[in-house]
């Protein structure tokens, strides 16, 4: 359409038909000076000399095309050398030049410069540039179409190969699954046996430790060392009191001995020790006291008080007497305090004691074999999942509607950005649109791919992206993308015409229409 417009512009200079002021060339036949004038709406017929007499006779204002008499009239600007234009008749002779040829101000006293020629020149240059963009864009579009044809064939070939290889890989995965399960069975049995043996050993060690504690307690309780613990001997430990009165009565002691008056070592361990274990306190004082911690030499030393002078002999004797009295008082206090509970000897490292020992050589061999089988199975399973994903992606891309000839296919794996004063807008065609603050922050979805929404005659001129992030107390964000012809691919503008509804323009060669044949130049003429 651009080149025909270029051809029409110079033709305007050659056409000049006599007609009343303000009448267009297409309507001049309605204004015949030799006949009465009939209003264009048929509302009246008047003598022709009443046309443009500055009095409105027709309801549609058609009798006053060149004056401002009718409020609903229209004045036609011829604008020779540029584009014709209709203006409301109330702008005629209003002192403002609306027509580039100045014909609307013929009787206002205003002198209008005729700018039509210059405007026509600029218009032709603009149209020529647009025509050049269209030609170059369409040339690139044909390349895009050919590229997609080749790429589509390659993708279809790749899809067939993947679909054929999928069955083989599925069989391999199932085979490796069987191998894995077979390798895991002896591994599981060997690990369970190792666990069981370790737990048995741990239980035996704890039982041995408990028996040693009971033996020590029995030895302490057997004051007369006759090989038995009697009620009287048990009563020497009031902490075993069962009724809370602070003393162990004979009846309570006999109850702890299961009704007997005495018990030997075997019965003591089997029946008595469990009942008194938690309350029993050893008569022996702990001998291994923790050594005082060494001073931290790295810490700054506090200011020390002055060292006192050496004491005299009399002072030393007094200090020794005071220390002896203090020791006697401490011994009396210790005798009154309850003895510490009998506790098992602590291992050097409890974590080491509870830690299961390493597997034996045969068990470790089963574990290594099972792990190798698992690794091979998991690797094959990952390969199968990757292949299935590749198949899905190829099927989706091959079947996607990329335009009449696939010219928009090259946009499928691309993203384009436009930075404004506040935001960075990102368009990934056929996938999503988003925005994020220019100074940093999380992106906000402006919609995901919906469909082509151009008019019926130009379906592929607009895209719709829907179901973006919801607005506060509003709808989900959505974006319409208009596709414009251009030699390059770029987002040229983004606006928000309505709340949460965005409009984006994408320039692309794929949107360029086929241009008409180029008009012959002045030198390219045929001889008659």
UniProtKB/Swiss-Prot annotation:
Q: Where is this motif: Prevents secretion from ER?
A: 525-528
Q: Which GO terms describe its molecular function?
A: calcium ion binding; phosphoprotein binding; protein kinase C binding; transmembrane transporter binding
Ranges for region Disordered: 234-266, 281-357
Q: Where is the signal peptide?
A: 1-14
Q: Which residues carry this modification: Phosphoserine?
A: 24, 89, 168, 383, 390, 434
Residues covered by the LDL-receptor class A domain: 37-71, 72-113
Which residue positions carry a glycan here? 72, 476
Return the GO cellular component terms, semicolon-separated.
endoplasmic reticulum; endoplasmic reticulum lumen; glucosidase II complex; intracellular membrane-bounded organelle
- List modified residues, type N6-succinyllysine: 166
Q: In which pathway does it act?
A: Glycan metabolism; N-glycan metabolism
Coiled coil, from the record: none
Its main localization is: endoplasmic reticulum
Specify the MRH domain's residue ranges: 413-514
Q: Which residues bind substrate?
A: 49, 53
Localization recorded for this chain is: Endoplasmic reticulum
- Which disease annotation does the entry carry? Polycystic liver disease 1 with or without kidney cysts: An autosomal dominant hepatobiliary disease characterized by overgrowth of biliary epithelium and supportive connective tissue, resulting in multiple liver cysts. A subset of patients may develop kidney cysts that usually do not result in clinically significant renal disease.
What is its biological role? Regulatory subunit of glucosidase II that cleaves sequentially the 2 innermost alpha-1,3-linked glucose residues from the Glc(2)Man(9)GlcNAc(2) oligosaccharide precursor of immature glycoproteins. Required for efficient PKD1/Polycystin-1 biogenesis and trafficking to the plasma membrane of the primary cilia.
Quaternary organization: Heterodimer of a catalytic alpha subunit (GANAB) and a beta subunit (PRKCSH). Binds glycosylated PTPRC.
Protein name (database record): Glucosidase 2 subunit beta
Q: Which gene name belongs to this protein?
A: PRKCSH
């Amino acid at each position: 359409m651009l080149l025909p417009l270029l051809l029409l512009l110079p033709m305007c200079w050659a056409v000049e038909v006599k007609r009343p002021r303000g009448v267009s060339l297409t309507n001049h036949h309605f204004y015949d000076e030799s006949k009465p004038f009939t209003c264009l709406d048929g509302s009246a017929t008047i003598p022709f000399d009443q046309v443009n007499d500055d009095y409105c006779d027709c309801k549609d204002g058609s009798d006053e095309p060149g004056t401002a008499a009718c409020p609903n009239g229209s004045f036609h600007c011829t604008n020779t050398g540029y584009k014709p234009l209709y203006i409301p008749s109330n702008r005629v002779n209003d002192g403002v030049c609306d027509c580039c040829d100045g014909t609307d101000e013929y009787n206002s006293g205003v002198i209008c410069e005729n700018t039509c020629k210059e405007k026509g020149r600029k218009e032709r240059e603009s149209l020529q540039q647009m025509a050049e963009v269209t030609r170059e864009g369409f040339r690139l579009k044909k390349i895009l179409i050919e590229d997609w044809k080749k790429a589509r064939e390659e993708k279809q070939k790749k899809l067939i190969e993947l679909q054929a290889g999928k069955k083989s890989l599925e069989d391999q995965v199932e085979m490796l699954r069987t191998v894995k399960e077979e390798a895991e069975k002896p591994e599981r049995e060997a690990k369970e046996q190792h666990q069981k043996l370790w737990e048995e050993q741990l239980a035996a060690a704890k039982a041995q430790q408990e028996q040693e504690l009971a033996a020590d307690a029995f030895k302490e309780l057997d004051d007369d060392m006759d090989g038995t613990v009697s009620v009287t001997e048990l009563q020497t430990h009031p902490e075993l009191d069962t009724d809370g009165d602070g003393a162990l009565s004979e009846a309570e002691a006999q109850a702890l001995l299961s009704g007997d008056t005495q018990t030997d070592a075997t019965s003591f361990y089997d029946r008595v020790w469990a009942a008194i274990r938690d309350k029993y306190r050893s008569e022996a004082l702990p001998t291994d006291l923790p050594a005082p911690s060494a001073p931290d030499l790295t810490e700054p030393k506090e200011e020390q008080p002055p060292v006192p002078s050496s004491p005299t002999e009399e002072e030393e004797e007094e200090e020794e007497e005071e220390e002896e009295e203090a020791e006697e008082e401490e011994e009396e206090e210790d005798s009154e305090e309850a003895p510490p509970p009998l506790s098992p000897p602590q291992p050097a490292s409890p974590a080491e004691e509870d830690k299961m020992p390493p597997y034996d050589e045969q068990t470790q061999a089963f574990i290594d074999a099972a792990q190798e089988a698992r690794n091979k199975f998991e690797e094959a399973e990952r390969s199968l999942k990757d292949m299935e994903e590749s198949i899905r992606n190829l099927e989706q891309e091959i079947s996607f509607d990329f335009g009449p000839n696939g010219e928009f296919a090259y946009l499928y794996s691309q993203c384009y950005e436009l930075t404004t004063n506040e935001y960075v807008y990102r368009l990934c065609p056929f996938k999503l649109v988003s925005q994020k603050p220019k100074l940093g922050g999380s992106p906000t979805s402006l919609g995901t791919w919906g469909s082509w929404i151009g008019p019926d005659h130009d379906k592929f001129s607009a895209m719709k992206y829907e179901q973006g992030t919801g607005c506060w107390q509003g709808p989900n964000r959505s974006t319409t993308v208009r596709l414009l012809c251009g030699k390059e691919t770029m987002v040229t503008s983004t606006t928000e015409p309505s709340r949460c509804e965005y409009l984006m323009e994408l320039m692309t060669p794929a949107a360029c229409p086929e241009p008409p044949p180029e008009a012959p130049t002045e030198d390219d003429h045929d001889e008659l």
